[in-house]
Amino acid sequence: MTTSPGVPEPSAQLLRLAAEVRQAAMALGQSDDNQRRKALIAMANALLSSSEQIVRANRLDLEKARTEGLAAALMARLKLDESKLNSAIEGLRQLAQLSDPLGLRQLHRELDQDLVLERITVPLGVLGVIFEARPDAVIQIASLAIRSGNGALLKGGSEASHTNQAIIEALKNGLAETEIDPEAIALLTTRQESLALLRLDGLVDLIIPRGSNELVRFIQDNTRIPVLGHADGICHLYLDAAADLKQALQIAIDSKTQYPAACNAIETLLIHQSIAPSFLELAIPAFRQARVRLLGDSASRALGVEESASEEDWATEYLDLILSVKVVPDLEGALDHIRRYSSRHTEAIVSNDQETAERFLQVVDSAGVFHNCSTRFADGFRYGFGAEVGISTQTLPPRGPVGLEGLVTYRYRLRGQGQIVADYANGECMFTHRDLPL
């Protein structure tokens, strides 16, 4: 990774703020499980007390975005009504009840008598999180950071500025009632700060971008700090010859329409040729009723899909009520298409043939591979993680929805009684390498 000349040096003010967050994060990392649980409950209570102000602030952002012609997909993400806010608060309370991710002993090994090695989970340090039009992300990320013992520098899109400010004030007010320093989380407010954040190696340990393909790729190309995220969410649903048509339609509708602006919504529907006529006879009117615009290949157009899909469509993340449709000859045809166009986020198969389903689950190299269920389940909250900071499509861990376990690293601790390597090199001592109970 190289840093672009267009990325400014951090200002003295930003360096000072980042140093304050890092100092608070060091103390946070030493806090105990109970202190961090209480902090999250206090944050949830503060959000509830401030819910009226937060929703009102969001209305201001929505009105401004509407007058500026913000895209429908971004408008959907920007909206934070009372129901959505209450869900985020409930997620925060559930997060407080999850097991402590810190201090877990992953390895316990005797190297020799009185020479014992441990591997213990510890916080990463400070997270730098950049996101667009997702004010509920402030709640998710700040709460995950506190629960996992990490500080966080947050930069939301300008379109959500009023909402983000109202949320961060409530969260800090909640923390002020606890033993956790509110300075562990901070909100950046300008584009210059978000760009300069990319140069804070040494103060920030991980960058997490949540937003458009362009945003994620820009960040990946312009920082030396490790980046966790995905640049696209091109998800596929394959309907096998052995699919139950009613179930297939239900899953397809949910995977596309339940929240089309989500990165785990499907963008391409692949249909086995043997069921394509009967399935599309049911699906075309159902998708029309759901206001989904279908774009098809020549085979699906011959079966009633009205518009043509271009080569570009197969590689497009619509984030809208648009769905590409393709008829494939068999499972291998579906797998070939997925290999070529998938962003390795989430793919699903609908089939009552267990052997076919197992092959799909084994072969598809995506972060999530599902059988007979909606791709919309690819979510940290639905996985029981409490919340997520984002979804990683990289092969190295963490992968998929990243919750608490993805926000910790580990440290090796070795306790001895004066042992030196020379004694093992000359053969005076021998390693036992005996695993001990965790």
From Swiss-Prot:
Q: Would the keyword Transport turn up in this protein's UniProt record?
A: no
Subcellular location(s) per record:
Cytoplasm
Q: Which GO terms describe its cellular component?
A: cytoplasm
Task: Give the catalytic activity.
Answer: L-glutamate 5-semialdehyde + phosphate + NADP(+) = L-glutamyl 5-phosphate + NADPH + H(+)
| Keywords recorded for this protein, A-Z | Amino-acid biosynthesis, Cytoplasm, NADP, Oxidoreductase, Proline biosynthesis
Question: Principal place where this protein is found?
Answer: cytoplasm
> Pathway involvement?
Amino-acid biosynthesis; L-proline biosynthesis; L-glutamate 5-semialdehyde from L-glutamate: step 2/2
In which domain of life is the source organism classified? Bacteria
Report the EC code(s) recorded for this entry: 1.2.1.41
Which terms in the Gene Ontology molecular function aspect does this entry carry?
A: glutamate-5-semialdehyde dehydrogenase activity; NADP binding
EC top class named in words = oxidoreductase
NCBIfam families on file: PRK00197.1, proA
PANTHER family from the entry?
A: DELTA-1-PYRROLINE-5-CARBOXYLATE SYNTHASE, GLUTAMATE SEMIALDEHYDE DEHYDROGENASE
Function of the molecule:
Catalyzes the NADPH-dependent reduction of L-glutamate 5-phosphate into L-glutamate 5-semialdehyde and phosphate. The product spontaneously undergoes cyclization to form 1-pyrroline-5-carboxylate.
Please report which protein family the annotation says this sequence is part of.
Belongs to the gamma-glutamyl phosphate reductase family.
Recorded protein name is Gamma-glutamyl phosphate reductase
